[in-house]
Amino acid sequence: MEALGVTTILLLVCISCLLFATWRSRSQKGKEPPGPTAFPIVGNLLQINPWNLPKSLKELSEKYGPVFTVHLGPQKVVVLYGYDVVKEALVDQGDDFSGRGSLPLIKKLFQGTGIVTSNGETWKQLRRFALTTLRDFGMGKKGIEERIQEEAHFLVERLKNTHEKPLNPSGFLIHAVSNIICSIIFGDRFDYEDKSFLSLIDWIEENNKLQTAIQAQLYNFFPTVMDYLPGPHQRLIKNFEKVDKFTTDIVMEHQKTLDPTCPRDFIDAFLNKMEQEKGNADSKFTIETLSRTTLDLFLAGTGTTSITLRFAILILHKYPEIVEKMQKEIDSVIGRERSPRMSDRSQMPFTDAVIHEIQRYIDFLPINVPHAVIRDTKFRDYFIPKDTLIFPMLSSVLHDSKEFPNPEKFDPGHFLNANGTFKKSDYFMPFSTGKRICAGEGLARMEIFIFLTSVLQNFTLKPVVDHKDIDITPVVTSMANMPHDYEVSFVPR
């Protein structure tokens, strides 16, 4: 018994020493950001609303300040709330905060191997290669503008064939936007009646709805439990696997038909790069990273822009007076005959302001795509341990009431000077900022402007309900804000 007592005492002493050493190490490094007390397993789930995480984080920022800690289940997250801290972290200390954090659902779907979710040297090499190669295949150049103009023409013709029948434009918009990124990464566009592509559009559309389900939100808190439970989150995962297979099959077909001397698209260029690095055991260019990067580019090049355009049509058919003013500007600068082009935008301050306000108002990614610190980091007066998940809240910037008075109201005046000229704002960062800024920002801006002005050049938007009953409030999900379902008639002008 005495030996057992001595052993117990020694064990307690050792544990105490370890706890003291841990406390001393942390105290020397500095205090971590404050936050609500977290409970075992559930973290702060009882103190926040998983149905509306951005709203809960806003309320916590009012109590704990612009830098605070919250626990999503067992996952610790440091939240950055407000323009100053977001800019300071992502730009001024951009390297420290350049890691890609991952919520459980994102990790489940993307596996951390493509350009969006990878880290370290893999991410650096893939991003550098993607930016160079996408430019080589026209992104940001005159060639891609002409492709968008051509696709806008196909979209307009398709809308004319609806003969003013009320419809949900979601599928049409996804198809048009997808064809732009498809022409770059796959080397060709898809016909609007292509059955395999229509199935792909259906999976994407369904997932846009499924991610609003509470089960999808809860997956980010309790992934292990949710993996075993039935529900819409399981269908979301299965649909994603189908989209993954669609892009992987195209990659496999490219392998069979590759002509190294004449690369047709991004996939061919990547396959050539793989061949060049064949003898390099540490090469980041593998068939796995090609498949994941292709999927990343396809989804990123489709999702953000098509959903923004869905929001745009929803918002604008609520405000016919705004549409009328845009159409006057379109008729004056572009006319009814030729296609809109990016060079027109500088002469169309009201239209430019409306597009900026749409992106600001919808706040597409309220918590941003999560970041992580790549090393132990001193930020302001706080210590943030390496690999800590970071939420740089874009909603806190896009809905800042000092920069944008009455931010919850849709108002193009947020981007107009008193004399009607366009007003820039440093707070406009729907594509994020810093080292992880969206690689396709330029392409997305071009698509949104050309597609939207082409639609308004040719059609008046006719609602199927009274204007005052049109709900433009975004539906909040754990990953992105989504528009309500709606129908609208496209009446030729």
Where are these regions (language model features)?
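Cytochrome P450 heme-binding "Cys pocket" and the immediately downstream C-terminal segment
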Residues: 320-322, 441-479
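Terminal signal-anchor or tail-anchor transmembrane helices
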Residues: 1-28, 179
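Cytochrome P450 heme-thiolate monooxygenase catalytic core
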Residues: 99-107, 141-309, 325, 475
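Cytochrome P450 heme-thiolate "Cys pocket" and heme-binding signature region
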Residues: 380, 418-448, 474-475
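Conserved cytochrome P450 K-helix E-x-x-R motif and the immediately C-terminal K′/meander segment
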Residues: 45-58, 62-65, 242-249, 339-381, ...
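Classical protein tyrosine phosphatase
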Residues: 32-37, 79-89, 96-98, 187-198, ...
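Cytochrome P450 substrate-recognition site 1
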Residues: 29-147, 168-169, 173-183, 196-225, ...
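Conserved cytochrome P450 K-helix/beta-meander segment immediately N-terminal to the heme-binding cysteine loop
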Residues: 392-420
